[in-house]
Every structure is written in structure tokens, then in C-alpha cells.
Amino acid sequence: MNVGTAHSEVNPNTRVMNSRGIWLSYVLAIGLLHVVLLSIPFVSVPVVWTLTNLIHNLGMYIFLHTVKGTPFETPDQGKARLLTHWEQMDYGVQFTASRKFLTITPIVLYFLTSFYTKYDQVHFILNTVSLMTVLIPKLPQLHGVRIFGINKY
């Protein structure tokens, strides 16, 4: 028995999406965002769907693909300091259930948004660019890659 040690992960960022109820909470948060946007007067339903998609994808991009490091003191000699949250998730193992969920969620939201905006050209272009912005960094080939040196340090 190790006295004075906790039974937690070395880096809590690696397992946060595997916590109980986190997927349901995530979907409910997206639904809540959509309902709040729907309650704004004089905003049409297609605009609300596009705003829901854009806000979700912007938040996902910022929190998963630009913020690096961990808010915890980790004994990994600073390895997590240079990794984004997406790269830390599940210890960098690709194609886990959490990664699949976070990859499929913006795609489903994109399909819903495209349907409810009736494939309007402006909405379609905005939503497609937004989707590509969050899907491309999730590709396994881009694990640890910094395009043009952006977010290198």
C-alpha cells in the first residue's frame, strides 16, 4: 500500500470524457445552447441552427485543439505541456469511444443544421467550413502536427 498517494490518473485530462454521464451532459449542453438561442426574439430558425453549430464548433476547436497543457501538476516531466487536450485524451490512443463520440457529434449537428436551414447556400458554406475546421485537426495523421508552426509553443 502506498501511503500518501492518490488513486487517480497521472494526467486527469486523459480520462475526462470517459466519466459517467459526460456524453449525456455534453448533448444536453448543446440542446440547452440551442434552446437559449431559440428564445432570442426576431432570430429565424435557420439562423439559430447555424449559430448553434458555429458556437459548438468554435468552442470545440478552442478547448480541444488550441488549449495546451493541463491545469494539474503532473509527474510526466512536462510532456503534457506541449499537447492539446485532444492529443492527451485517452493517452493518445486513436479511435477510442470518446474520440469517436467527439468526432461524430459535430457531423450529426452539421447534418441537422443543413436539414433545418434547407441547404441554403450561405448557411451551407459557413457550416461546412466550420465542420472542416473541427474535423481536420482530429485526423490521426495530424496528431502532434502544428501546421505553419501555429500553436507550436
From Swiss-Prot:
Biological process annotations from GO: ceramide metabolic process; motor behavior; myelination; negative regulation of B cell apoptotic process; negative regulation of ceramide biosynthetic process; positive regulation of autophagy; positive regulation of protein localization to nucleus; regulation of ceramide biosynthetic process
Primary location recorded for the protein, binned into one broad class: endoplasmic reticulum
GO annotations of cellular component type: endoplasmic reticulum; endoplasmic reticulum membrane; serine palmitoyltransferase complex
PTM annotation (Hydroxyproline): residues: P137
Pfam families in alphabetical order: ORMDL
Chain positions covered by the region annotation Important for ceramide level-sensing: 1-17
Post-translational modification: When hydroxylated at Pro-137, ubiquitinated via 'Lys-48'-linkage, leading to proteasomal degradation. In endothelial cells, ORMDL3 proteasomal degradation is controlled by the sphingosine 1-phosphate receptor signaling pathway.
Transmembrane segments: 22-42, 43-63, 95-117, 122-142
Topology term for the membrane: Multi-pass membrane protein
Signal peptide positions (record): none
Residue ranges, Extracellular side: 118-121
Reported consequences of knocking out the gene: No overt phenotype, although knockout mice show elevated brain levels of sphingolipids, including dihydrosphingosine, dihydroceramide, ceramide and sphingosine, compared with wild-type animals. Double knockdown of ORMDL1 and ORMDL3 show elevated brain levels of sphingolipids, compared with single knockout and wild-type animals. At 8 weeks of age, both male and female ORMDL1/3 double knockout mice weigh significantly less than wild-type mice and exhibit impaired myelination and motor-function abnormalities. The triple knockout ORMDL1, ORMDL2 and ORMDL3 is not viable.
InterPro entries tied to this protein: ORMDL
Subcellular location: Endoplasmic reticulum membrane
Spans within the Cytoplasmic topological domain: 1-21, 64-94, 143-153
This protein's record includes keyword Aminoacyl-tRNA synthetase: no
Record keywords: Endoplasmic reticulum, Hydroxylation, Membrane, Transmembrane, Transmembrane helix, Ubl conjugation
Keyword Isomerase assigned: no
Family: Belongs to the ORM family.
Purpose of the protein: Plays an essential role in the homeostatic regulation of sphingolipid de novo biosynthesis by modulating the activity of the serine palmitoyltransferase (SPT) in response to ceramide levels. When complexed to SPT, the binding of ceramides to its N-terminus stabilizes a conformation that block SPT substrate entry, hence preventing SPT catalytic activity. Through this mechanism, maintains ceramide levels at sufficient concentrations for the production of complex sphingolipids, but which prevents the accumulation of ceramides to levels that trigger apoptosis.
Oligomer and partners: Ceramide-sensitive subunit of the serine palmitoyltransferase (SPT) complex, which is also composed of SPTLC1, SPTLC2/3 and SPTSSA/B.
Comment on protein domains: Ceramides bind to ORMDL3 N-terminus and stabilize it in a conformation that physically restricts the accessibility of the substrates to their binding sites in the serine palmitoyltransferase (SPT) complex, hence inhibiting SPT catalytic activity. In the absence of ceramides, the N-terminus is flexible and permits substrate binding, thus liberating SPT from inhibition.
The protein, known as: ORM1-like protein 3
Species whose genome carries this gene: Mus musculus (Mouse)
Gene encoding the protein: Ormdl3
